[in-house]
Amino acid sequence: MSDYVDGRDSGGTGMSAGSLVHTLYIGSPDGNSFGSADRTAVVEMLSSCFAGFTINDAEGFFEGRPVATLIVKIATGDTPAVEEVTRSIGRKLGQRKVGLELKGLYQSISMD
């Protein structure tokens, strides 16, 4: 078992203690592939809040229908900032809800 000192593993693995990973599930406005304008808007909104993140294209399902989905991974301890940008993205795309997963728990973030 290793102890972390100053954010580094004193056991010699060179790994940091890490950050929470937040995962967003963002469906496309019309269910089809994301248009370049919508994708650019998502990237710009995320970039204005976080130095780094990862986006994967996926096919999700909502109410039994396939929906082009962006899965976004953000490593940060600032959950309120993630929730705020999630709502901003959802409103920009005209979504009712955007999915947020944290610590293995999924919740739908409402735009209300």
Regions found by a protein language model. Name each.
Residues 2-112:
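Positively charged, small/polar-rich N-terminal and surface patches that mediate targeting and assembly
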